[in-house]
């Protein structure tokens, strides 16, 4: 009986550790996905003003 309790306790402990590691890995993957979206938004924010200035400069040159 004691060895069976010991085995069940060991399985429970190992299962808890496994679930904890899976949760950490899942959180890390979600953070990577979030970072990618934030990076794309930052690039868009940087690109749009530069593109606007470039187009206005080109239209000024072509209009002369």
From Swiss-Prot:
InterPro entries: Frog_antimicrobial_propeptide. It is found in: Secreted. Expressed by the skin glands. The modification Leucine amide is found at residue 62. Transmembrane segments: none annotated. GO terms for cellular component: extracellular region. Pfam families: FSAP_sig_propep (PF03032). GO terms for biological process: defense response to bacterium; defense response to fungus; innate immune response; killing of cells of another organism. Residues 1-22 form the signal peptide. The keyword Transcription does not apply. Keywords: Amidation, Amphibian defense peptide, Antibiotic, Antimicrobial, Cleavage on pair of basic residues, Fungicide, Immunity, Innate immunity, Secreted, Signal. Residues 23-46 form a propeptide. Belongs to the frog skin active peptide (FSAP) family. Temporin subfamily. Antimicrobial peptide with activity against Gram-positive and Gram-negative bacteria and against fungi. Has been tested against S.aureus (MIC=1.25 ug/mL), B.pumilus (MIC=2.5 ug/mL), B.cereus (MIC=15.0 ug/mL), E.coli (MIC=1.25 ug/mL), B.dysenteriae (MIC=5.0 ug/mL), A.cacoaceticus (MIC=15.0 ug/mL), P.aeruginosa (MIC=5.0 ug/mL) and C.albicans (MIC=1.25 ug/mL). Also shows a weak hemolytic activity. This is Temporin-ALd. It comes from Amolops loloensis.
